[in-house]
Amino acid sequence: VYTADPVPPAALGAERPVATFCSWDSELTLGEGRSIPAWLISEVTVRPTHARRGLLRRLMTQDLTEAHEAGFPVAALTASEATIYGRFGFGAATFNAEVTVDAHSRLQLKAPTVGTVEMADNLAVAELAPQIFERFHRATAGSLRRTVKWWDYVSGQWNWHRGAAEPELRTAVHYDEQGRPDGYVSYKFLPTQGYEG
């Protein structure tokens, strides 16, 4: 959304958006091999200088109306400020967990290891990850299909924030006991102020 108002001197130009909104069709797994069409929403922003003018309400209402008219039975969104979307019928469906591993001391895993993990070539992971995810997606209730660009992101071929490749990203693949790939991870080492050894 771009402003039609005159732009004062030194302000961001009219060619810069004052609000963004992205939506696309996808698929939501219900479990037991069943899935339904889903309408996904992301990248919803309103510039603080244009807040409280009804932009979010108009964008969301128009988009959800079009999704409903197109026959989508469910809509889902990613949001950094989830509380503002309750008025549109959205609520928390899942939570995120983050794990930090202290690698300075000896790390002992209590569960028995199953299969193996190998460092992987990022381009190979870009090809392999969609196949691994498809098996997970079909078996996991609540899973949403990934976009094509996602595989570039998890393999370091593209970073949304940087707008370019991310060559420092590393990948690894988990192989089951029969040697079939059944999981992957992408990660990077963050710079530190020094090493505590």
At which residue positions do the language-model features occur?
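Exposed loop/turn and edge beta-strand positions of beta-sandwich/beta-sheet ligand-binding modules
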Residues: 35, 40, 168
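Amide-forming acyltransferase catalytic core, primarily the GNAT-like/NAT-type
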Residues: 97-197
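Conserved beta-strand in the GNAT
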Residues: 3, 10-26, 40, 45, ...
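Short, conserved catalytic-motif segment at the N-terminal edge
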Residues: 26-35
